[in-house]
Amino acid sequence: MIRTEEMLLNVGPQHPSTHGVFRLIIKIDGETIKEATPVIGYLHRGTEKIAESLQYTQIIPYTDRMDYLSAMTNNYVICHAVETMMGLEIPERAEYLRVLAMELGRVASHLVWWGTNLLDIGAVSPFLYAFREREMVINLLNELCGARLTFNYMRVGGVKWDAPDGWIQKVREFVPYMKEQLKGYHDLVSGNEIFVNRVKGIGIYSAEEAISYSLSGANLRCTGVKWDIRKDEPYSIYNQFDFDVPVGEVGDAWDRYMCRMAEIEESLKIIEQAAEQFPKEGSVMAKVPRIIKVPKGEAFVRIESPRGEIGCYIASEGKKEPYRLKFRRPSFYNLQILPKLLKGENIANLITILGGVDIVLGEVDG
């Protein structure tokens, strides 16, 4: 009989697989994980408290730095909350630009996840392909707003800049190219026996457990729960587009992988439709006072980000700054199930499970 001894092992706070400052204290017995304790807060910047002393427009750049892989959806959620409280009607052209920006951002975010997750478990080539395509998306967004990562593009009432000449055509050309690349991704990885063995049956949880942990996004849909805010509680102009909500079956790492890959395809459908229906003329900004004062009251809105359900709560006293601002950050909630998933697993599966949850530490810590 082999004698083993329990020992504590620190993963992070600076470890390549965490893609940020995140510490995981694991208790192992041989190669089996007995207990896992996440330690967060290394990237906490007090965004919500800072916002209490900022005007509403000044808050937008701070949202870029929460989920910095999906800054457009973060920009939108704060604008959407303020617009809801003010009862603003957004110009149609602005709404189309918002949707195009958010869905391009969703594609770019999932490409980063695909490439880095596979790199973490030993596949180098997909990382290079993913960042090749992501660079094309980032260049499109750069042309639109002059930034590559932290965009600060959306405004209360619309967007800062109209699309430059020829931009919509470039978006149209990108869609068929990306669809073709996705087929190559599946040929390279999804049908690879080694990869399938690394993810099938790993990190399983049920739909009931997902709901009890308040999971959202692909982490919820992988269990078979068909819930997407864009479809079930449409905001902006999402009700004008035809797209599906991909779901999994058993809630393992394979289902999470396939859900996100399918989500890229659905985002491309939305982008294609939005580019075809894009209004030929019109304003990109509603008439909004330079100094925004939100009526007294409170509101909560939620939208679908690449990581899941991001929400924004605002309490206003009728001033130019919020009395209280609170974000529901999906990565923070999705992370909570990690200790349960890791308990009893082989240590070799740790990186696979962590990568499948797809957290962004700027969003976890806030």
From Swiss-Prot:
Localization per Swiss-Prot or TrEMBL: Cell membrane
Reactions this protein catalyses: a quinone + NADH + 5 H(+)(in) = a quinol + NAD(+) + 4 H(+)(out)
Keywords: Cell membrane, Membrane, NAD, Quinone, Translocase, Transport
GO cellular component terms, semicolon-separated: plasma membrane
Main location: membrane
SUPFAM superfamilies: HydB/Nqo4-like
The keyword Membrane is annotated on this UniProt entry: yes
Domain of life: Bacteria
EC number: 7.1.1.-
GO molecular function per UniProt: NAD binding; NADH:ubiquinone reductase (non-electrogenic) activity; quinone binding
Topology class, membrane: Peripheral membrane protein
Key word Membrane present: yes
Family membership: Belongs to the complex I 49 kDa subunit family.
Function statement: NDH-1 shuttles electrons from NADH, via FMN and iron-sulfur (Fe-S) centers, to quinones in the respiratory chain. The immediate electron acceptor for the enzyme in this species is believed to be a menaquinone. Couples the redox reaction to proton translocation (for every two electrons transferred, four hydrogen ions are translocated across the cytoplasmic membrane), and thus conserves the redox energy in a proton gradient.
Subunit composition and interactions: NDH-1 is composed of 14 different subunits. Subunits NuoB, C, D, E, F, and G constitute the peripheral sector of the complex.
Name the UniProt record assigns to this protein: NADH-quinone oxidoreductase subunit D
Species of provenance: Bacillus cytotoxicus (strain DSM 22905 / CIP 110041 / 391-98 / NVH 391-98)
